[in-house]
Regions:
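SH3-family beta-barrel domains
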Residues: 8-12, 20, 24-72, 86-90, ...
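Localized chelating/binding microdomains
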Residues: 16
Length: 197
């Protein structure tokens, strides 16, 4: 014969033990996680991230440029999908973030994404000069050094062709001018990326 209320006491007792075990584990786990987090950070810093490839066999994500003067950006990877917007700027750099058969999901400098047919994209590299900096012009330098002489001043959002990038500096060409720009001031190349044309 069961005692009255015994079942509910067992349930409450079990719940209290579970909560207590969770608190003890949380306190113990947080101390041990601090050391393992530091070790994980050291390991991550010394190991390169795995390279992801798309249907084309090329690395994802990667930067390319628009090959045509008019490029329809669709909501999905087929001609049946609605056109979300149209790019009208040949040479504009975009980032390929995914692939599906012959379609490429691209991202622009403002973060908008959509699908484009692969033949409308070029492997040629281009950049936008500091599109996030507003109206502040950026110096195109004679050499890859902060103290070098300016060849020209570039407005934010100006497009340029990439000649080469060292990982810290990029040599770009724009309207008959060639020079160097701090790589972190460009959209269309990754930080630390080396580019040879």
């Amino acid at each position: 014969m069961a005692l009255p209320g015994c079942g509910s006491r067992l349930v409450w007792g079990g719940m209290c033990l579970a909560v207590l075990a969770g608190v003890v584990y949380g306190l113990w786990g947080s101390r041990s996680d601090a050391g393992s987090a530091a070790a994980a950070q050291e390991t991550t810093a010394s190991v390169d991230m795995p390279v992801r490839t798309g249907d084309s066999g090329l690395q994802l994500p990667r930067f390319v440029t628009l090959k045509a003067d008019r490029v329809n950006v669709r909501r999905g990877p087929s001609n049946e999908h609605q056109v979300s917007w149209v790019f009208t700027r040949k040479g504009l750099p975009v980032e390929i973030v995914a692939e599906f058969e012959h379609w490429r999901r691209i991202r622009d400098s403002e973060g908008a994404e959509g699908w484009v047919y692969h033949s409308l994209l070029s492997g040629r590299r281009g950049v936008l000069v500091a599109p996030w900096s507003g109206a502040k012009p950026l110096a195109l330098l004679e050499e890859a050094a902060a103290e070098a002489s300016a060849v020209a001043l570039l407005n934010a959002g100006v497009m340029a062709d990439v000649d080469t990038c060292t990982g810290a500096w990029c040599r770009i060409s724009i309207a008959g001018h060639d020079g160097w720009v701090d790589q972190e001031k460009l959209w269309g190349v990754y930080p630390g990326e080396q580019v040879d044309r």
